[in-house]
């Protein structure tokens, strides 16, 4: 399967068409961004690590009965995926307080959240991804209530699967975001799951093993990503 025209260039991935109108090539680049793209740096091996990490996680989720767009790996930095009609709203699950939740509510970072919090954000860099709710989704026609309910169901199911997966690897799944789209009318998990879009802490030390290392200038970004991958059993080389 050969990639053809570039369709979309995001902050860390590029999407290409293929000869099959139902399939796309997703290329993971070495770019890393913070502040809605205001700060961008390149890190060697990052595209490869995130591509293989994402394929590993999507495979685990598919095995648990969650429909995903993943077809197969094509190269170190590319995978073949189904073409989805993307929903412009992302789903976030929070198992512990961190990031914007701490700033917004003034709660202590690391506070356990039981039951986990489910948030929705409009995907819009210019507006800094504002928080929305199901009423906004219905009024503005971003996604039907039926499909939104399915997105929420699948997000919580993914959380159950991934919390155990990371716990077994000595990691706390603090929070993560998922993006969904429609494929022939069915809600399907798209985009990616990687340390770029999740918060992962070491269970013993509470060291941050995700993109917060870049956001907070802690250093050791790729070393942390690779350490997480190795703990999970992701084959990188």
From Swiss-Prot:
Q: What is its EC number?
A: 6.3.2.6
Q: List the disulfide bonds.
A: none
Q: Pathway, according to UniProt?
A: Purine metabolism; IMP biosynthesis via de novo pathway; 5-amino-1-(5-phospho-D-ribosyl)imidazole-4-carboxamide from 5-amino-1-(5-phospho-D-ribosyl)imidazole-4-carboxylate: step 1/2
Keyword Ion transport set for record: no
GO BP annotations, alphabetical order: 'de novo' IMP biosynthetic process; cobalamin biosynthetic process
Q: What class of enzyme is it?
A: ligase
Q: Which GO terms describe its cellular component?
A: cytosol
Keywords of the record, alphabetical order, are: ATP-binding, Ligase, Nucleotide-binding, Purine biosynthesis
Q: Which InterPro entries match?
A: SAICAR_synt/ADE2_N, SAICAR_synt_PurC, SAICAR_synth, SAICAR_synthetase, SAICAR_synthetase_CS
Task: Write out the catalysed reaction.
Answer: 5-amino-1-(5-phospho-D-ribosyl)imidazole-4-carboxylate + L-aspartate + ATP = (2S)-2-[5-amino-1-(5-phospho-beta-D-ribosyl)imidazole-4-carboxamido]succinate + ADP + phosphate + 2 H(+)
Query: Which Pfam families does the entry link to?
Result: SAICAR_synt
Q: Does the keyword Nucleotide-binding apply?
A: yes
Q: List GO molecular-function terms, semicolon-separated.
A: ATP binding; phosphoribosylaminoimidazolesuccinocarboxamide synthase activity
Q: Which family does it belong to?
A: Belongs to the SAICAR synthetase family.
Q: What is this protein called?
A: Phosphoribosylaminoimidazole-succinocarboxamide synthase
